[in-house]
Amino acid sequence: MSHRYIPLTEKDKQEMLETIGANSIEELFGDVPKEILLDRELDIPNGEDETTLLKRLSRIAKKNITKEDYTSFLGAGVYDHYTPAVVDAMISRSEFYTAYTPYQPEISQGELQAIFEFQTLICELTGMDVANSSMYDGITAFAEACILAFSQTKKNKIVVSKGLHYQALQVLHTYSKIRNDYEIVEVDLDGTVTDLEKLEDAIDDETAAVAVQYPNFYGSIEDLEKIKSLIKNKKTLFIVYTNPLSLGLLTPPGDFGADIVVGDTQPFGIPAQFGGPHCGFFATTKKLMRKVPGRLVGQTEDDHGNRGFVLTLQAREQHIRRDKATSNICSNQALNALASSIAMSALGKQGLQDIAVQNFENANYAKNQFKDAGIEVLPGTSFNEFVIKLDKPVKEVNDKLLEEGIIGGFDLSEVNEEFGQAMLIAVTELRTKDEIDTFVKKVGEING
């Protein structure tokens, strides 16, 4: 019987050697120079039985600080949200348990339909015409949107708000290096929102796109209507990076005339874990449909008139025309897209709206509590994040909060020195009034 982790027994090895006419492993690799062969056993521990191994791994895992054991007010792009129990139950089914888009639609109708439903839900949330089957994460989806703008408009300049997630800006600058003539212009903030006067000055006839985040990285809700009005040249695209949960409460970017809407569905059924995996989405207009990166699932009919699903418009993709492909995306996040689809479906339209309202109300309750405690809260209309100013270094405050069982907010001094000692705080539907009150009290005591 084979070992459960090592498929070859000594008997198996001997039979294989006899089949190929070798007497030993050493003879099999006889052509490898002896001077590069290791002549001793590897300096690693011996194997352990399953019980001992599980105990060891459990001890290691307990060293981690998790949101299950602590109260978290950390966001900055990854949030502590409720995940319906049905999500894990459904995505664990063997027929769904893959991250790949199926290339054989005739035998993958269930998976393709699930992706089609994901695309439909994203379109309904964003107010756009078309959405792709998913991307690696929201930040790479944003960078791909900017590359599309360069390609579509034949212009080489993109104007972006500094209110975008700092990692989105970093990735965009990396992507822009594929061409020496791509220009990225970053527009300063006025407080915690984009400075509209500076934005207007930065936009000209050579601008391929204007990009903002809604709500932005600092938690404030940008005025998309005014920003759209500044884009006078119809050939300049309007790109919006958004939190999809916020669209349960906020007006969809599509209603303001956005050309491309991107984001990350992590708030819907995807745990906050290390660096991912996440699930980016990319939604746009029919006009730009043939420029969309990644996979698109379309609905069709078979010869008998039955509804079916296929990968459509594949001529955009690198496995069809590598030299003319719209991107180098070769896979996606099908499993996480399914998780998000199930979460959205389980919540329903009303449930999604209710959770969005809870985020808004909890965050604004926390803001008022901080103000009452004499702690400065930076102005701006918030969805579920906001910024406070502290007298002490944020790292010092967070370290002491951790001792109290609280994961504090994001230290903005690490990414934007202009804010000084400022903490970005996220308050989701999972935070109770008592937890918020305790957090505010502890921050006040530590800050002195």
Swiss-Prot record:
Stored InterPro entries: GcvPA, GDC-P_N, GDC_P, PyrdxlP-dep_Trfase, PyrdxlP-dep_Trfase_major, PyrdxlP-dep_Trfase_small
Pfam families in UniProt: GDC-P
One Gene Ontology MF term: glycine dehydrogenase (decarboxylating) activity
E.C. code: 1.4.4.2
Record's keyword terms, sorted: Oxidoreductase
Entry-linked Gene3D superfamilies: Aspartate Aminotransferase, domain 1, Type I PLP-dependent aspartate aminotransferase-like (Major domain)
Top class in the EC scheme: oxidoreductase
GO biological process: glycine decarboxylation via glycine cleavage system; nucleoside metabolic process
Reaction catalyzed: N(6)-[(R)-lipoyl]-L-lysyl-[glycine-cleavage complex H protein] + glycine + H(+) = N(6)-[(R)-S(8)-aminomethyldihydrolipoyl]-L-lysyl-[glycine-cleavage complex H protein] + CO2
Family: Belongs to the GcvP family. N-terminal subunit subfamily.
Function: The glycine cleavage system catalyzes the degradation of glycine. The P protein binds the alpha-amino group of glycine through its pyridoxal phosphate cofactor; CO(2) is released and the remaining methylamine moiety is then transferred to the lipoamide cofactor of the H protein.
Quaternary state and interactors: The glycine cleavage system is composed of four proteins: P, T, L and H. In this organism, the P 'protein' is a heterodimer of two subunits.
Protein name (record): Probable glycine dehydrogenase (decarboxylating) subunit 1
Organism: Staphylococcus carnosus (strain TM300)
